[in-house]
Amino acid sequence: MTVFESLMNKLTEKGALHFSLLDPDKVTMDKFIELAKGAEKAGSDALMIGGSYGVNEGTLDNYIDAVKQEVKLPIILFPGSVAGLSRRADAVLFLSVLNSTDPYYIIGAQVQAAVLMAKHYSNLESIPMAYIIVGEGGAVGFASYAKPIPFHMEDVIVAYALAAYYMGFSAIYLEAGSGAREPVPSSVVAKVKRAVRNKILMVGGGIKSPEAAYSIALAGADVIITGTVIEESPAVVLKDIVDAVHRGGLRRLSNSNENANAWVNDK
């Protein structure tokens, strides 16, 4: 079973998943291992590893090898450049920054990475992902020369998500930016999810409280990603956020089942 299939099975059970994002460039290896173990203990469903700057294959290999000795969660690469690949990982988010103003981040880096994948990283499972940077955008917005879409321009965000849907991406990621002051609004999440239907909707950036996590999961996010809160907050905060993601997902599943039953009863 592939990583994607395994996560889809979990999604069917839980309604929403939580991924912990860890950046090897920001912490020592010992701290990195500590954070990974904390994420697993908190109930996170997968580890995303990567960053906007400064990560290379050698560093990734060492960090991933160390983490794999301590945790059993799937490790998914979230590369900020073609240097962010590692044979030690289980899968990679093969992403395109749809609203970058530089073609390199839309297709150029992907062409380079594709050749590397075919020649040297054939063991890595590829998960095609459309990356749409919204709100403040954070460091990744600067690094990828993106033009972040303001939250109030909901129709524009939906239009980009629809483009990803019709282009056949498996997953669509709405990114508000690492450490953003506000997360993607639930109203935006709900509209995008209605538009992209069965595609995996990922949401990250600025999610610092259980209340925000629950609201976003309930609105339609299939996967919620937190990174900064893992590095800056006590482990209990992460557990509360993970629990809130799963509660929101289960509530959404329950609502869907109730609506389906009501439709059947009306017939």
Swiss-Prot record:
One of its GO terms (molecular function) is magnesium ion binding. Transmembrane segments: none annotated. It is found in: Cytoplasm. It comes from the Archaea. Pathway: Membrane lipid metabolism; glycerophospholipid metabolism. Its main location: cytoplasm. It is an enzyme of class 2 (transferase). Its EC number is 2.5.1.41. It holds the Pfam family PcrB. Mg(2+) binds at residues 23, 52. SUPFAM superfamilies: FMN-linked oxidoreductases. InterPro entries: GGGP/HepGP_synthase_I, GGGP/HepGP_synthase_sf, GGGP_HepGP_synthase, GGGP_synth. It catalyses: sn-glycerol 1-phosphate + (2E,6E,10E)-geranylgeranyl diphosphate = sn-3-O-(geranylgeranyl)glycerol 1-phosphate + diphosphate. Its cofactor is Mg(2+). Sn-glycerol 1-phosphate binds at residues 173-179, 205-206, 227-228. GO terms for biological process: glycerophospholipid biosynthetic process. The keyword Lipid biosynthesis applies. Keywords: Cytoplasm, Lipid biosynthesis, Lipid metabolism, Magnesium, Metal-binding, Phospholipid biosynthesis, Phospholipid metabolism, Transferase. GO terms for cellular component: cytoplasm. Prenyltransferase that catalyzes the transfer of the geranylgeranyl moiety of geranylgeranyl diphosphate (GGPP) to the C3 hydroxyl of sn-glycerol-1-phosphate (G1P). This reaction is the first ether-bond-formation step in the biosynthesis of archaeal membrane lipids. Belongs to the GGGP/HepGP synthase family. Group II subfamily. This is Geranylgeranylglyceryl phosphate synthase. It comes from Caldivirga maquilingensis (strain ATCC 700844 / DSM 13496 / JCM 10307 / IC-167). The lineage of its organism: Archaea, Thermoproteota, Thermoprotei, Thermoproteales, Thermoproteaceae.
